[in-house]
């Protein structure tokens, strides 16, 4: 989303985004009540946010532990052929998130597995491509943080004289 598009979002749009991120199952009538708009007005605003790609989807958040995935881990993957890594990620259902990154590693993958043997099997697939390093996630402190439009404060320009002082 560009800063120009950010400028077009008003306080109602921001509240709509906050409410839907907290509970995407709200009816349009209830959402309208919460943001002080009529149901047709809020429906139109949500439609525009979807059309602009700001709202990119709705999903259920599941508890991976309750689904049988007792271990979550991060796999850092070194340099390897991009297409081969992408293909392997797509073929690995245990891969919850995959990030192509800068720095020492080229990829950071988040995986969910049943146990240590399952972890070893998944990591071994990526070891065939390149070197890896694995960290088991002990505790999740923050996840699925709701985000609102970026609001960077304007930076004050300092004169060269004030910098030298």
Where are these regions (language model features)?
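A compositional/biophysical signature of low hydrophobicity enriched in polar/charged and small residues
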Residues: 1-165
